A protein has these predicted regions:
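Bacterial N-terminal signal peptides
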Residues: 7-17
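Boundary at the C-terminal end of the N-terminal hydrophobic targeting segment
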Residues: 19-23
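Solvent-exposed, conformationally flexible loop/turn segments
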Residues: 32-37
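Extended acidic/polar, glycine-enriched regions
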Residues: 78-143
Length: 143
C-alpha cells in the first residue's frame, strides 16, 4: 500500500504536466496540403466583444510558422465561440489563426499571446504581458 501511494505521488506531477500541455494544443483543421488553408484554433481566455479587456484591442495573438528557411509571422484573432457566423455569439474562448503553407513537409509553429491596453496596435513585439495559458505554445503539423 505504501509503495502504491509513493508511485501515485511520483506520477501525479507528470500527469498534471501532460494535462496542461494538452490544454494548450490547438485544434488543427483544414486540408493539410500545400497552398490549402490550415486553421489553428486555441482555447484561450474567455472574453466578450463588449467586455474589458477588449479581445480585439487588448490581446495580441501572433503565430510564427517555420519550415526549413521559410518563416512567416501570422496574426490571429478572437473567434468568440468558434462558430459566431452561425450562432451570433459575441463571447467565448476561441482564438484562431489561418495559414496557407507554401511547401510540403513538417511545419513548426510558435505562439506569442500578449495582453495589455491597446497591445493589438503596438509596434513593440514585447508589449504587454504574456498570457500564460497560450504564450510559448509550440507544435508541428505535416503537409
Amino acid at each position: 500500500m505504501r509503495a502504491l501511494r509513493l508511485i501515485c505521488l511520483l506520477l501525479l506531477p507528470a500527469l498534471l504536466a501532460v494535462g496542461v500541455a494538452r490544454a494548450a494544443s490547438p485544434e488543427v483543421s483544414g486540408e493539410l496540403k500545400k497552398w490549402h488553408k490550415v486553421t489553428l484554433t486555441f482555447d484561450g481566455p474567455e472574453c466578450s466583444e463588449k467586455g474589458t479587456p477588449n479581445p480585439f484591442m487588448d490581446y495580441r495573438l501572433n503565430v510564427t510558422f517555420t519550415n526549413g528557411e521559410s518563416r512567416y509571422l501570422v496574426p490571429g484573432y478572437f473567434a468568440a465561440d468558434g462558430n459566431a457566423a452561425n450562432t451570433s455569439a459575441d463571447s467565448g474562448n476561441k482564438w484562431r489563426v489561418h495559414f496557407a503553407p507554401d511547401a510540403e513537409g513538417a511545419w513548426e509553429y510558435a505562439v506569442s499571446f500578449r495582453q495589455a491596453d491597446g497591445v493589438a496596435v503596438s509596434d513593440d513585439p514585447d508589449a504587454g504581458e504574456p498570457v500564460a495559458e497560450l504564450d510559448g505554445t509550440t507544435g508541428t503539423f505535416e503537409i
